[in-house]
Amino acid sequence: MAIERTFSIIKPDATERNLTGAINALIEKAGLRIVAQKRIRMTREQAETFYAVHKARPFFGELVDFMISGPVVVQVLEGEGAILKYRDVMGATDPSKAADGTIRKLHAKSIGENSVHGSDAAETAAIEIAQFFSGNEIVG
């Protein structure tokens, strides 16, 4: 399997509970390296751009409001099969359906406040990474 990069967001419900370290430990335990990380407060424009694919969905406004409600930690993760591996580490979007030991099973409050985001494909990862990081901020 090839070395690849994926994008992660530790969402406001997790940062408000000081879970960044616990989530990072699960990421690293899975064999992924955190090659870029920063804590930011997303602007409304950033959140709307990031979630533009959901603009027509009824939950779009609520999602944007949630993502700007507090700090988030944006990350670039690297490793063999990083995209699928991180999606496995995150667990199902609905924490009640997530496997034991996954980030969402352990830490998510609800399907809406599900603690983390991860890219779903290589193309998406590249776009998402570029939205928040310049090349010199990613140190592998």
From Swiss-Prot:
SUPFAM superfamilies: Nucleoside diphosphate kinase, NDK. ATP binds at K11, F59, R87, T93, R104, N114. GO terms for molecular function: ATP binding; metal ion binding; nucleoside diphosphate kinase activity. It catalyses: a 2'-deoxyribonucleoside 5'-diphosphate + ATP = a 2'-deoxyribonucleoside 5'-triphosphate + ADP; a ribonucleoside 5'-diphosphate + ATP = a ribonucleoside 5'-triphosphate + ADP. GO terms for biological process: CTP biosynthetic process; GTP biosynthetic process; UTP biosynthetic process. The active site is at H117. Its EC number is 2.7.4.6. Keywords: ATP-binding, Cytoplasm, Kinase, Magnesium, Metal-binding, Nucleotide metabolism, Nucleotide-binding, Phosphoprotein, Transferase. GO terms for cellular component: cytoplasm. Its cofactor is Mg(2+). Gene3D superfamilies: Nucleoside diphosphate kinase-like domain. Its main location: cytoplasm. Belongs to the NDK family. Major role in the synthesis of nucleoside triphosphates other than ATP. The ATP gamma phosphate is transferred to the NDP beta phosphate via a ping-pong mechanism, using a phosphorylated active-site intermediate. This is Nucleoside diphosphate kinase. It comes from Bradyrhizobium sp. (strain BTAi1 / ATCC BAA-1182). The gene is ndk.
